[in-house]
Amino acid sequence: MLKTVLMPSPSKCSLMAKRDQDWSPNQLRLDILDQNARDADPRGTGFDYAEEFQELDLDAVKADLEELMTSSQDWWPADYGHYGPLFIRMAWHSAGTYRTTDGRGGASGGRQRFAPLNSWPDNANLDKARRLLWPIKKKYGRKLSWADLIVLAGNHAIESMGLKTFGWAGGREDAFEPDEAVDWGPEDEMEAHQSERRTDDGELKEPLGAAVMGLIYVDPEGPNGNPDPLASAENIRESFGRMAMNDEETAALIAGGHTFGKVHGADDPEENLGDVPEDAPIEQMGLGWENDYGSGKAGDTITSGIEGPWTQAPIEWDNGYIDNLLDYEWEPEKGPGGAWQWTPTDEALANTVPDAHDPSEKQTPMMLTTDIALKRDPDYREVMERFQENPMEFGINFARAWYKLIHRDMGPPERFLGPDAPDEEMIWQDPVPDVDHDLIGDEEVAELKTDILETDLTVSQLVKTAWASASTYRDSDKRGGANGARIRLEPQKNWEVNEPAQLETVLATLEEIQAEFNSARTDDTRVSLADLIVLGGNAAVEQAAADAGYDVTVPFEPGRTDATPEQTDVDSFEALKPRADGFRNYARDDVDVPAEELLVDRADLLDLTPEEMTVLVGGLRSLGATYQDSDLGVFTDEPGTLTNDFFEVVLGMDTEWEPVSESKDVFEGYDRETGEQTWAASRVDLIFGSHSRLRAIAEVYGADGAEAELVDDFVDAWHKVMRLDRFDLE
């Protein structure tokens, strides 16, 4: 007989202490960089997912998924006897959080399992979808990540219901904690409608991608809950555009996704649904949205509050969605869940859909305001009419757009695993040419570094060019970086932050060295401009260290190639243009976010730790590598020499700092004894003396005798940034 042991009620007390951030809400957050510094994976640092994945029998996994999808479970019955539509929604909502503005979100990491995503209203009841998958995840263990399984389940569901997909690639490693770096919006409550999410011009603020907090894209009822299709079309275009989807891809995705399944609103969600998973009682074991309406499942399911199917065959791929949308007229009404939805005015569609659970019942198709938007907006309608006339084109476009959706955050194809990945090179993957020559060795590297240092280029110019090339990398979606030398192409060559006139001079000099070297070779050894840009930065760092009395060699791995304009989507790369780069003391004039916050954001995208960020800023300042050669933060009488002068000044008490203006973006430093102005600084510079944690790190490098440690740590951090995109070396 089981014995019940009474435990204290969780409502009586809590041993969970307040965080420092709770006491000091304006404190600069470094926890997003701490995530880069620690390994939360319980399998340890030696775990190699790619190696484990190679042992996976993918066909066996898909067979298991097929059996699961067609085996309805009593605890959560499948609509129409098939879990395919539920799995498609799960995969879509996992990948659909991706936004191009900062590359964050997306399916990698499988973070739909964690707060806040697991408790978003738009993800209601997806906890059941993941719980259905647990036996498969349990079976394959470390060979198959949650991140891959979630997407694979949705991809195979499409094939199970009749459409051949474009392919699928594995390689998404699991995270074991939420990504604290993602800014989901300013709201304090889910689905709040407020202007703070938008600029004065009505545009979504960067880096946001969703129109409403807690929704993947837009409000299905229409903006602010108003059934206005044309206004909805504007929101759709903006939100999907932030995900790098054009009108054709957007229309294909919505039409294809809504070809399957139904929405659930048997009654009002607010009156019937319990707490979200993160707030639900412990005995619910991680499941949320407990439904007290009827049976709480099957025909009584409540998710969004909108109720009904789109087509007459909800688990078959066909043109039913497009035909219903375009061939019939629709009018708005409040459904049984109290939400706006659209019903056909033509009685011919009434009761034409089998009920999802009761074969004796029939339902009438419905549409969302976001569906009607595809009919009312002239540009979307043009695409939809073309798809209606050419069903095969519709299928191909959906398959390709779906593939892009679920792989957009994975980076280049070198990271893709498995036999189902297509061979086709797609421009949104930022392709670079294969290496078609022998690579330079140590002798050639030394020769080229000498050639570079014998030019008129300065340490600052070489360092800034290499940094500008490599620091476009975003670990969020594995885009950017030095490989490809796209800094010489549009749009990067004309970005303000890259100082186009100076950049042109540096690149011309390096291209001349490249041409002379390659033409002089009698063998197949060649050097790319991409490699030469990095090598120039390395040579400058070595020279700066030597001038400070330290003999160092910056590691260098050749093998980068030079991308062509045809391999470069100019509009796509505009998303990589930094709002600010605190490492160069640069910020756009229109930026209203504190510079130190943007520094941490940039450091996170570069996968840096607080220590690496600190040593890079201090080192770059000593090298004089600032935007437009500004004296902001260059606290040294010997710019171009790798010293710890920056830290000595920022930590010392000889200088008193005063803001230049009310905005407190720029500061002047005055000698406390003489009153003479000695230095100028940005917020990025002063944060290393102001912030307690950063000051503690800075003190390591600012101490007497610490310069050698600074040089070594700077070289390590510099090398890390230079090779962040070298997936070919992994």
From Swiss-Prot:
Role this protein plays: Bifunctional enzyme with both catalase and broad-spectrum peroxidase activity.
HAMAP family named in the record: Catal_peroxid
Residues reported to bind heme b: H258
PROSITE patterns xref list: PEROXIDASE_1, PEROXIDASE_2, PEROXIDASE_4
Subunit structure: Homodimer or homotetramer.
Family: Belongs to the peroxidase family. Peroxidase/catalase subfamily.
Keywords, sorted A to Z: Heme, Hydrogen peroxide, Iron, Metal-binding, Oxidoreductase, Peroxidase
Gene source species: Haloarcula marismortui (strain ATCC 43049 / DSM 3752 / JCM 8966 / VKM B-1809) (Halobacterium marismortui)
Cofactor: heme b
PANTHER family: CATALASE-PEROXIDASE, HYDROPEROXIDASE I, BIFUNCTIONAL CATALASE-PEROXIDASE
Any one GO molecular-function label of the UniProt entry: heme binding
EC number(s) reported in the record: 1.11.1.21
Keyword presence, Iron-sulfur: no
Domain of life of the organism encoding this protein: Archaea
The keyword S-adenosyl-L-methionine appears for this protein: no
InterPro entries found in the cross-reference section: Catalase_peroxidase, Haem_peroxidase, Haem_peroxidase_sf, Peroxidases_AS, Peroxidases_heam-ligand_BS
The protein's name: Catalase-peroxidase 1
One Pfam family matching this protein: peroxidase
Catalytic activity entry: H2O2 + AH2 = A + 2 H2O; 2 H2O2 = O2 + 2 H2O
Site, as annotated: Transition state stabilizer: R89
GO cellular-component term (any): cytosol
UniProt lineage: Archaea, Methanobacteriati, Methanobacteriota, Stenosarchaea group, Halobacteria
Disulfide topology: none
UniProt cofactor note: Binds 1 heme b (iron(II)-protoporphyrin IX) group per dimer.
UniProt-annotated catalytic positions: H93
EC class name: oxidoreductase
Positions bearing the Tryptophyl-tyrosyl-methioninium (Trp-Tyr) (with M-243) cross-link: W92-Y217
Location in chain, cross-link Tryptophyl-tyrosyl-methioninium (Tyr-Met) (with W-92): Y217-M243
